[in-house]
């Protein structure tokens, strides 16, 4: 099985780093996925030096996986502002930091979560 890389777009993605960077790293995340949080907290910091010197650009794309524990992340993603990558990336980091709290919520809590995180529904 091969993957068609030509179908990857930067639509609905957060870009961290220069568009002119020669290396683009496309990362698929879910705001409620513990592996995504682990990567962001423990692996991604090693890329900061390369982002700062213009070698690497991170392209974060949401992975909408139909799995009960991830449903809140799926819905919250719909309200992220992809036109302001820096501000939205700060929010993504906050959502990862609060992931355990988010996990206690279900879809009925989305309006309250949106209010708490200043998301417009």
How should these model regions be labeled?
Residues 1-4:
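N-proximal helix/coil linker or "cap" segments that precede and/or mark the start of modular domains
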Residues 6-23:
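A short beta-strand-turn-helix
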Residues 19-34:
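Short active-site neighborhood of thiol/selenol oxidoreductases, capturing the structured segment around
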């Amino acid at each position: 099985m091969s993957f068609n890389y030509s179908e990857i777009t930067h639509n609905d993605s957060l870009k961290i780093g220069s568009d002119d960077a020669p290396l683009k790293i496309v990362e698929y995340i879910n705001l409620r996925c513990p592996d995504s949080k682990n990567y962001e907290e423990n692996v991604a910091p090693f890329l900061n030096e390369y982002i700062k010197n213009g070698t690497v650009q991170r392209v974060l794309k949401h992975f909408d996986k139909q799995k009960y524990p991830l449903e809140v992340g799926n819905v919250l993603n719909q309200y992220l502002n992809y036109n302001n990558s820096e501000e939205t990336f700060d929010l993504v980091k906050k959502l990862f930091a609060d992931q355990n709290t988010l996990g206690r919520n279900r879809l009925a809590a989305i309006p309250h979560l949106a209010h708490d995180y200043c998301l417009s529904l």
